[in-house]
């Protein structure tokens, strides 16, 4: 499964010394039909509508894709974004110089005027998704050559993306799943005025490097903070001194109390891909 998609990756019960996990990846639009009842039995207190809704603000509005490859979270009503240090690494490196080495020394803006704008950075909000399998597969037939099949599918994908981008307001992506047997389109909204708020020194943020990256528990301050700016109406805008912090539809409160035994937990984000359902013959 490709990037750019928003999934519930796993739902788990936190139990000391052992973790019982219902592992896998699921589309948010199928949460109510496939997973919600089991998640409630495990302790989930949110409704399916509070996790994914296209008509009201929901949890999906607080989980964003950061610069095309990472997951990040909205953690304030004023557009503050939390992500990993390694996800913000390129932006931090771009803003650094021999005189102001933010990678080495870290950086914290004392006020919003001190927040720093890298040249190329964006945050992507997930708006909605839908199934377009029947439409895509209706333009192909078994007698087609592979080249003709690909051409027909790509032409239909281009139509779907154009029909749903509302004149360029949204980014639309059609993606194949299950070896091209299912197709879904995803609608996103991109914000490009994203500024660095704070980062720890590289010695903390990248401590352990890729060796520790795959281990748990970790002892790494692997985080960085940014802020999204928008025009006065909350719409995406190019960088301007007149832009204001985005008021997100939803943000996550930070609980300083930590987790307790038997608390419900789940992961919501933008993973890479999975071959979980590949048959034995395909391995």
What are these regions (language model features)?
Residues 3-11:
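Sec-dependent N-terminal signal peptides
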Residues 4-5, 16-283:
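Terminal presequence/propeptide segments associated with secretion/organelle targeting
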